[in-house]
């Protein structure tokens, strides 16, 4: 979906399923790609969106969102986004759900936001479960809970950096009002791979609750025998906070 394109309802639900192609020469075979487009469920409508990246190419995310005003949102219903990264062989950079510069997943009113992603099955690096990266990249709510769960690609045997959830380069995950923010991540990788964090908050990335809600983070490092397979890591001004709740 490019800039200016939209899918919307006035009071109904939106259900979208997308699957990338499987040609061995294909790259960026995202299951669902939103580049400046918008998906909006009005009234009490909900959004359920699922994407699976192509099984052969590299850089094939399950769900890929980028470029303002790209967004998936509701007026008050729940928003659920799930994705499975594609790839095979030496494929890399196949995230389950990638929310990149200028893109947002949100819910209005008391609607909850659920995002779940599983990194691709290639043996390369950067097969994140959920990636929130870049200025304006945001997963948020107006008053409901925000729940993000990511599983890094488990077949990464050559290099590491298959994080469960990465919040990077000023990307943000946050709930407002009474909503709690819960982030759960499982690092991927096998053999001697390293730097497969469960949850990594890096380069001014932020996980927060701006109201009275709590922040709950659970991270499990990858299974490789290399270094830095930590559960939860903050680096380079990464930020975790709650304005009125516990962390």
Describe each model-derived feature in a short phrase:
Residues 1-247:
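Surface-exposed loop/turn motifs in large extracellular/passenger domains
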């Amino acid at each position: 979906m490019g800039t200016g394109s939209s899918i919307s309802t006035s009071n109904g639900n939106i259900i979208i399923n997308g699957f990338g192609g499987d040609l061995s020469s294909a790259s960026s075979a995202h299951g669902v790609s939103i580049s400046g487009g918008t998906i909006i469920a009005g009234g009490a409508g909900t959004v359920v969106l699922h994407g699976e990246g192509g099984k052969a190419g590299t850089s094939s995310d399950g769900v890929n969102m980028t470029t303002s005003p790209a967004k998936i949102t509701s007026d008050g219903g729940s928003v659920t986004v799930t994705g499975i990264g594609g790839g095979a062989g030496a494929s890399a950079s196949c995230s389950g759900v990638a929310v990149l510069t200028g893109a947002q997943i949100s819910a209005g009113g008391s609607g909850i936001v659920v995002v779940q992603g599983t990194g691709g099955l290639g043996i390369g690096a950067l097969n994140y479960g959920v990636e929130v990266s870049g200025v304006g990249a945001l997963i948020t709510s107006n008053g409901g809970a925000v729940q993000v769960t990511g599983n890094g690609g488990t077949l990464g045997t050559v290099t590491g950096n298959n994080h469960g959830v990465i919040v990077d380069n000023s990307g943000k995950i946050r709930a407002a009002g009474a909503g709690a923010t819960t982030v759960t991540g499982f690092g991927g990788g096998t053999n001697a791979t390293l730097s497969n964090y469960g949850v990594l908050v890096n380069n001014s990335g932020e996980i927060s609750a701006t109201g009275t809600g709590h922040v709950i983070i659970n991270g499990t490092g990858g299974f490789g025998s290399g270094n830095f397979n930590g559960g939860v890591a903050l680096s380079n001004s990464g930020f975790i906070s709650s304005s009125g709740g516990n962390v």
